[in-house]
């Protein structure tokens, strides 16, 4: 059930800016993420709706998405990512879990700055936003006044609307621990419905 991250777009950090993408001197620069934050997201993936809590903790090298799909009896679904390149995807209600060694860590706070292309100012639901695109992977909307993220549009068609953004919020350490069945020999039960509403928007890709 791969989703956001979380390691998210890390491979993009290594991409140099193309010559045509060099920002003009008067173009604004994306605001780096704060080292720690909590964002509530409304996700729309081709009509499949979900709510997500995104916990970003750069100092501790971890990123967590807690996702609740519309009217899902087995919510929530967890996507925990670590800076050592390990991710865990699990649904406690089903006791399902799988892990992935993606080989890269979580996004750096300034992940959007190198290689992004400024697209200008646009309205996003009543918010006046600066807009950047990066590597045909994401279009990023940032509020001009507050410099906080407003909307993310991924290459898969997934749209994340940022409903709240708490700078400095930190989740308790116990909430980051993957359940014990993630570490058993079979890694938990196989999930019969891995594809429901998921895409790879938040999973780093080796080739872009």
Set out the residue ranges of the language-model regions.
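N-terminal leader/targeting segments and the immediate start of mature chains
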Residues: 2-62, 94-95, 174-208
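Short, hydrophobic/aromatic-rich segments at coil-to-beta transitions
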Residues: 31-42, 59-66, 124-133, 145-151
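A structural detector for beta-sheet-dominated domains
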Residues: 40-46, 68, 135, 155, ...
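Short solvent-exposed loop/turn micro-motifs enriched in small/polar/acidic residues
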Residues: 47-49, 113-115, 125, 133-135
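Residue-level signal for mature regions of secreted extracellular proteins and peptides
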Residues: 90-92, 122, 175
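Short acidic, Pro/Gly- and aromatic-enriched capping/linker segments at domain boundaries
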Residues: 105-123, 164-165, 170
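Gly/Pro-enriched, hydrophobic low-complexity segments
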Residues: 125-188
